[in-house]
Amino acid sequence: AAKAVGHHMILSTQSSTAIEDVAEAHDAPIWFQLYPTNRWANTVAMLQRAEAAGCTAVCLTIDLPGGRNTETQSLLMREDDRDCSVCHKGQAKPIFKGLDMKGVMLNDSSLTWSVIGRMKEVTNMKVLIKGIEVGTDAALAVQHGADGIVVSNHGGRAVETERATIECLPEIVAAVNGRIPIIVDGGFRRGTDIYKALSLGATAV
């Protein structure tokens, strides 16, 4: 579908289709959305596989390890007794093929800004930081060598009561000051929404 309309594509770590198959079907460079694991060797293996598949950039997802409120989820009582672990367990994802995922978590809360440099040591892909919502973090991303940022709140589900991403743009644009591209996602439902984001300084939506 993306190929048919000439649209760019970013493939998630959680994709149910192998990155090589998606890249071949798209017939143009795609990007890889990385959920960093708490085992660096596995993260490196995923980066190198994505690059070998033809990905030209990686979007490092940083907005999930936050202290999100999970009280409602903890109270959930399922009436359906079917086991859905086949859908959600790590080994089921094609990107993990050949990797030892026992005990591996997809949210590495120990990440620091140094991860940008570490990633650049093991891949030639451009490194973008996905999940930036404030100007301070945007400036730090530039300072530590990020090639771009994605203003994102993960659809609003990672941290509750956050601002809409378009509301975050002005301070982020000011902090970046044209030094790297700024992409924004979330809540864009019509063309006029896109024009608003571009007029506020986003490079792309």
Regions found by a protein language model. Name each.
Residues 4, 21-25, 38-184, 191-205:
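Alpha/beta enzyme core
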Residues 9-11, 31-34, 127-129, 183:
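Short catalytic-loop micro-motif centered on adjacent basic/acidic residues
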Residues 14-16, 35-37, 63:
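Beta-hairpin (beta-strand-turn-beta-strand) motif
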